[in-house]
Amino acid sequence: MKKYIPDLLALFRIFSAPVILYLLLLDGTDEGLMLVPAIIAFIAAWTDFFDGRLARKWDVSSKMGAFLDTIADKIFITFIFVGFTYIERVSVWITVFLIAREFIITGLRGLAGNEGISIPPSKFGKAKASLQFWAVGFVMVDFQLTILSFTIADLIVLHALIFSYISGYQYISGYLKQTR
């Protein structure tokens, strides 16, 4: 059973994303209703922290687990940022650029894999994932703690976008170096 726990944590992120989106669409402007999706998002963010660590600690890493972890992050961030855009907490252009980057790099990694090329995650890529989860938290917390300035969430979202494109550039340049 222990060998499935990391995969189940990634699956939790995948299945929590549409639930959070639904709750945001239900009434994402109601501060009281934001508590439930905020708690679910917080738990989901921690699953991202633990799934890989547990897989390595218990020596149950697998290709399926690595795939699920990567896809879970992309599904989670895509769903949540679409919801944030719908409730007008994040600009459309930020969501479009984040999602575009995710599709481009996922496609590139698939292409590289088909060619037998491995592009390991960079420090910027790992920081990007952390910043995206922090951004989700801060956007939601701004609804709960009105003493916080909205600019804190906006700055973290912007940093997540910047790190997304820096890590995207690293993936593309890593691929190009290996194909020349």
Which residues are covered by each model-predicted region?
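Alpha-helical transmembrane bundles and membrane-interface segments of multipass inner-membrane proteins
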Residues: 1-180
